[in-house]
């Protein structure tokens, strides 16, 4: 993997994400536009996946040449729908349930990866729906820095799992998603530290339903795609632990913990997300047998070029 390809595939999507996130979260006049701040992160994540894929694998075709090429196509749909979902933010529990059910059903129907039967697609759809319910609820209660830092950690971990699975394109895509989420974290942190509202209080940025919708869709999608093409030491339990990590933010709302505020409490909640991530990475990197790496790589390449 050349440095130039690495910079292009991760750097360009990150730049696109910065162009979308920074003005929407840091420029007051732009931030006040309805639905813009709440969709910026979601649109940026979707665009990051599409741009990273195109930099490494070219423009996806319709119908896709390989099953996993549905990822950028689904991401395009996420980009289009994020502003709509963001405008629905605050519509109440009915709106939340409708988005959860619809997003889970559509993604479970469209994403057909190798080794995925009907039960697997149902599980993916349920995972997407539950993730949206959790992240959309948490996004109303917690700072943007909490969720964006959590997503940065999760996408970074998924990139490492893909690297160990010899899935280079998805490694770069997850790296681009991690970098874009990192831009969101930096922007949310800057907004909170350096900006004030009319009463002189620190202004917190929320990722909104648009950001929650994109994150709840892309994390399970990337996990299932990585699992479907995994041969070797990276197993379903590792993908499951990392993919379920954002849901750990829900435990930060338990009685006795939910009343804690401030930057320290935000990082404590991020620590909850780190627990399953750390367990998964420790299990992977302590169980890797270098003698099996070549066999896994060859099988993976055969799967890719067979159009699966």
Give the ranges of each region predicted by the language model.
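N-terminal topogenic module of multi-pass integral membrane proteins
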Residues: 1-141, 252-268, 272-308
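Generic multipass alpha-helical transmembrane bundles of integral membrane proteins
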Residues: 97-228
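Membrane-interfacial segments
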Residues: 194-199, 232, 288-292
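Short alpha-helical packing/oligomerization segments
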Residues: 225-250
């Amino acid at each position: 993997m050349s440095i130039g390809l690495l910079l292009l595939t991760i750097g360009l999507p990150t730049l696109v994400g910065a162009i979308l996130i920074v003005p929407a979260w840091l420029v007051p006049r732009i931030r006040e536009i309805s639905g813009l701040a709440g969709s910026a992160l979601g649109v940026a994540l979707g665009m990051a996946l599409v741009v990273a894929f195109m930099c490494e694998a070219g423009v996806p075709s319709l119908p896709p040449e390989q099953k996993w090429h549905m990822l950028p196509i689904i991401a395009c749909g996420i980009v289009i729908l994020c502003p709509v979902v963001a405008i629905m933010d605050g519509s109440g529990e009915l709106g939340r349930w409708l988005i959860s059910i619809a997003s889970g059903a559509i993604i479970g129907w469209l994403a057909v990866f190798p080794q995925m039967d009907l039960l697997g697609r149902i599980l993916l759809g349920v995972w997407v729906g539950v993730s949206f319910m959790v992240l959309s609820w948490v996004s109303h209660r917690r700072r943007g820095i909490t969720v964006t830092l959590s997503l940065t950690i999760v996408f970074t971990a998924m990139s490492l799992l893909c690297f160990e699975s010899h899935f280079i394109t998805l490694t770069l895509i997850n790296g681009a998603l991690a970098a874009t989420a990192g831009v969101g974290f930096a922007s949310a942190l800057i907004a909170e530290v350096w900006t004030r509202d009319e009463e002189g209080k620190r202004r917190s940025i929320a990722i909104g339903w648009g950001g929650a919708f994109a994150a709840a869709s892309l994390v399970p999608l990337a996990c299932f795609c990585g699992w479907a093409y995994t041969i070797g030491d990276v197993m379903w339990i590792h993908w499951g632990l990392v993919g379920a990590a954002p849901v750990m933010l829900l435990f930060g709302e338990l009685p006795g913990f939910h009343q804690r505020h401030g930057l320290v409490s935000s990082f404590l909640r991020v620590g909850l997300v780190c627990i399953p991530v750390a367990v998964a990475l420790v299990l992977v990197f302590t169980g890797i047998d270098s003698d099996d790496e070549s066999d896994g790589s060859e099988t993976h390449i055969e799967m890719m070029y067979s159009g699966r």
